[in-house]
Every structure is written in structure tokens, then in C-alpha cells.
């Protein structure tokens, strides 16, 4: 019997990418589906959604409306992920042609969902921490691995605890076996995922080997054949000295750290319920620079959070100047349902929010230009992962710079030393030495 065709579109974060991989694995290995990039030939169309900001939620309904217009007769449409978790039945009301809704904590029910009319699985208490997922990887050379699910922080702007539930650590033996399996299949790098990865080990569903995130990094680095370990996202509150020292000293841990700032104002951080101050953040970031001079630090920043004054915003710019981030992901505050910040007084005018975002991004561009210029004539070890146009190939350095050289498919999955000859903001161009 010929395979049915599966089309999947993934929006949002790396955790969504891994969730999509899990669903693809379940469907291709257990339900006789094969992936297709042509939506018109698909028997099953999935969209894995994000709800961190308002824009992706609006995009969901425009996308599924487009799916309905082009899908073939009899094809099913499923809405999955975080937006599915918090909108639930509203999706059926606004898009009655959707066949099932599957929240982020319920992806293991995908085979049940495709067989049940108007199936809705949005229980954020459903436990997938020990679910034995079938295996699928979008990349041969890099493997995403969940080490925890959910979040307990309840930051006042964030909807994630309402869509992914409370935080539970995945047992070490499951993580270790998944990493081993990925390496055996050709992966050179594993990418550990969680809402707060460095809070790992605080709570398991059942009794398991006790360890913290630093211990986990050390244990995983013993896997033979594993070259690199990356992770996202750590929480600044849990960046103790032990964690920073393991990060700096373990040669398999990539020297790229994502440190979500959100705001440089201690008052705004308190209103956000982030649990740390500007001083704590700077202490940790500068300690990291001291321990690991070649580290690349990225961050998330929200401007125009309710009540943010010009002085508060200037505090954020001050942190930007002091830490000199290699990369920032910056956004205007987006009001999200079910969050405390949505009903806070002193919501910021859109014009002010846009101006602050522009100011922040322009200042970072100036900083970044100086950072990338310093990379010229340096030599980096690069893992090549992606073919580019014009007989070029791209990969990443240990500290996460994107590097492009002339090269062919035979370099995919290989490490090569590259000397940088021309550094741009988004790409470092170089030559293999």
C-alpha cells in the first residue's frame, strides 16, 4: 500500500521544531505517512503553532484558511502546539474545517487525533516526560533533545506555563539513550531543549537519579563520538558558579550562551517576576566573559513593558552597552491572554514602543559591527550543515557564528578549520585552511 502524504508547517521556537519531529516520527513510522513539501498532495496537513506573541496567533488563522482552499478532497487539517493549547475549542469555532486540535503537552496523542473526529487534546497536566517517542531528525548532523517540559516561573508577560504546563525534568536515562542513538546515526552535535534548561533536576514525575544541569552536561559529554553540546534556554536566576565553570571548562560544551535579559531595569524585572535584578544579571554575564573570553552571548529583550519609563528603558540600553551581546532578539511587549501583565496599568503607547525598539536595535547594530569586524583573520573550527547558492556551504563555529565558504556537498557533516576573510553582520565569509 502506498504511503499517505504528510505536510507540516512549524512556527516558533526550537522546542516546536523538536515537537514536530516527534509527530513526524509517530506518523511516518507507525501510520504509513511520508513527508511531502507539496501541500496540494497531502492527506494530512499539520501546523505546529506558537503563542508567545500575538502576531503568530493571527498568522495561524490566515494559514489554515489558506490550507482549506488548496487541500485536496478528504485531506485532514490539524492545529497543534501552544496556540492549540490556549485557544482549544475556539479554533473549531473560528475554523470549522479544522479536523483536530492538539496542544503542546499532548503531541504523543497524534495517532489518536488523526483517527478521532474533532479530537481535542489540550490538557497541560498530561505527562509526556517519559513518553517513548519514535525517532526522526530534520538534520543528520544535529539532534534536538528535550530535557524538560513546561515552566513553573509564571513571568507576568508569558503565556508558556498556560500552554506547556508545569515544569518536569525528563529522566537522565531517557536523555542519555536518545543522545547515544543520535550519535550512532551520525549526529555530531546535540542541542538540549527546555524552557529553563539550567533548572534541570528540580522535579521529576517519579523517583530518578538526582542531578542538576551541570551534572547532566558532564555526563553527556562522556558519550563517545559526541563532538558538541548546545542548549537553550537557561534562566539567569540559576546561573550559579558551578554552572558557569562547567560551561567554560568542558571542551564539548559550545561557547555560546543565551541569557534572556528581558529588561535592564530592576523595577521592571520585578514587575515581570523574573526573580533577578539588573546587578545580578550583569554579575553573571561579566563573570561568564571573564571565565570564557571567547563566549558569544545572545539575549531576549522586551521593550515597552507596562509601566516602563524612559529611565527604565535607558537601564536596558546600559546593559546592552556593558555586556555587548553578539545577538539580540528584541520585541515590543505583546499583550497575551491569561497573563498578569495584560491587565496591568500604564500600558505603553505604540509610537513610544516602536521608537524604543528602533533605538535599541540601532545601538546593537553599532555594537555588532565592531564585534564582527574583530573576527576577520581569525581561524575557527566549523561544522558544515547547509548547502548555499553559488557552490557555497555554511556551518557554525563553536561560539555560534555562521560561516560560509566555497564548497560542495561532500563537506556536509565535516569539521574544517576556516580563516575569516570578510566579516558581515549575519555571516562570516572565509576560506578552508
Curated annotation (Swiss-Prot):
The keyword Iron-sulfur applies. It catalyses: N(6)-dimethylallyladenosine(37) in tRNA + (sulfur carrier)-SH + AH2 + 2 S-adenosyl-L-methionine = 2-methylsulfanyl-N(6)-dimethylallyladenosine(37) in tRNA + (sulfur carrier)-H + 5'-deoxyadenosine + L-methionine + A + S-adenosyl-L-homocysteine + 2 H(+). It comes from the Bacteria. Residues 373-433 form the TRAM domain. [4Fe-4S] cluster 2 binds at residues 151, 155, 158. Residues 4-119 form the MTTase N-terminal domain. This is tRNA-2-methylthio-N(6)-dimethylallyladenosine synthase.
